[in-house]
């Protein structure tokens, strides 16, 4: 009876812890006591994990990374009171000591007038307090810093030797006098809003304290400091200047809010710009006349140094690259094993579907179910979840329902919905109250899934085995409603397959991340910065490289000469061929002309006898006519005929002479 009462108490306590959010210290102590009692009575890993999930309190998320890690350095926003990690927003713990008021980016976007305010360093405060005390103790020096012309010298000496006031009113006067000396940052000008450049000497100096960036000087503050310095220079008289060296205590002037600019003595004076092909003067405290010249020189150096570094990298094999490639091969082999395991799980799920379909088509075996019911003994046991005494026949059904009841008290959610190829294994039920998606397995989710309704004619269908592991090939044909031995066997089998799938997908995700890291290491190992900044000069390799380069140059020169000689020979051959072509063309033209002349001669030879016959006939006719005409007419006609004959004979002679010259 006492044990049962203890079990009832523990059950009531666990239900209360699952429903109520416990925040006080007393309730937390009660939770610890309850957890210890349950762990003592039920020392099981399933019970421990379930209690841990129920009693676990959600951690508060901070910073832009939305993590609950509070072990690192954090800084709070004075506007929205949100805490941020220093490494997430780029502020170190040393820098945070100099910040008086910090505002995050979200507050600055909502109200652009809000700006981060920095406090003065201890050295600056001491210098400012000394300057303020001396200015107050000086004769006739008001808050503006100007001294009257009629002030006596004796009063000045006595006032300098007087001790500084120690009362609260004097301290207030000192603080009020110190404020106009130092001046306040306006918070609205460009210098106040601009962040640190991280490039100037003020940003790089880390000795003693961090001075302010030269680009973050306040315009209003600089103007007030300039006015005060001009007033202090014009105010004191010559007598005061003579009396000043007699005082032993050296007075320190007020330090400006912005740090002093460090001047490099090597960069003083007029210097020529270091840029390539640039004859201009360099800027003050710089080596270049403009940023463009600096970029040009940097690119030129890169083009000069980088090719040699690439040759060095390609000559010597990298041991780290070989090891990363081996790791990559190993990771890919593991990925192939995971894919094979996922394919096997798909086959198992298909086989399970086939077994369920076969059970649906089969009929109930009433005789076998009665025999198994008679064989059950009447033993009792205790539930591992709630602790109640239950019958061994209904133990599996009771434990399943009890587990679902306690499982529904805890929530497992995420703000992102699962995106998977194929069948989704998770529940992904959206809870509008918590704005999360349920991340339980869909088969085992007790809140958002219900078991299908079982009819009287449904068969159990659970595969039967011998000695737990040896399947017989048969299945249970008892009614599904009355079969307590194989209660929810299909649900458990599907949950096992889905759980193994989740495990394999997580393993695949881990392997993909490892592959990404290895690939990034391979690509970043021979990048521009790595090759330019780090190099190992191997003399043996470089000597061999120089020798190879010289041999390559000699071979290249020989090849160039060979090509030039071949080109010269080719041009000569082309010229000779062109000359031969011209000669052949001329010979062909001469032959054509000779053939034409021969043809003309043959034609002329053929035409000459015909012409002679015609002439003879004409002469005979003319003679006949002359015989008929008078004698003087005959003489004239004879003369004309002779002239015509002479004209006809002249072109024949010229043609013959021309042909003789040609031949």
Swiss-Prot record:
Region spans: Disordered: 134-183, 230-254
rRNA processing listed as a keyword: no
MF terms in GO: DNA binding; methylated histone binding; zinc ion binding
GO terms classed as biological process: positive regulation of DNA-templated transcription
Phosphoserine modification, residue list: 258
Disulfide bridge map: none
Chief localization: nucleus
Zinc finger (PHD-type): 60-110
Binding, Zn(2+) 1: 186, 189, 192, 218
PROSITE patterns membership: ZF_CXXC, ZF_PHD_1, ZF_PHD_2
InterPro entries: CpG-bd_C, Spp1/CFP1, Zinc_finger_PHD-type_CS, Znf_CXXC, Znf_FYVE_PHD, Znf_PHD, Znf_PHD-finger, Znf_RING/FYVE/PHD
CDD domains: PHD_Cfp1
Compartment annotation: Nucleus
SMART domains named in the record: PHD (SM00249)
Chain positions recorded as Zn(2+) 2 binding sites: 197, 200, 203, 213
Pfam families associated with the record: CpG_bind_C, PHD
Bias (Low complexity) ranges: 134-161
Keyword Ribonucleoprotein: no
Keyword set, alphabetical order: DNA-binding, Metal-binding, Nucleus, Phosphoprotein, Transcription, Transcription regulation, Zinc, Zinc-finger
CXXC-type zinc finger span: 175-219
GO CC terms: Set1C/COMPASS complex
Its job: Component of the SET1 complex that specifically di- and trimethylates 'Lys-4' of histone H3. Essential for Set1 association with chromatin and trimethylation of histone H3 at 'Lys-4' at transcription puffs. Additionally, is critical for general chromosomal association of Set1.
Assembly mode: Component of the SET1 complex, composed at least of the catalytic subunit Set1, wds/WDR5, Wdr82, Rbbp5, ash2, Cfp1/CXXC1, hcf and Dpy-30L1.
Name of the protein this chain belongs to: CXXC-type zinc finger protein 1
Organism, as annotated: Drosophila melanogaster
Top-level taxonomy: Eukaryota, Metazoa, Ecdysozoa, Arthropoda, Hexapoda
Encoding gene (name): Cfp1
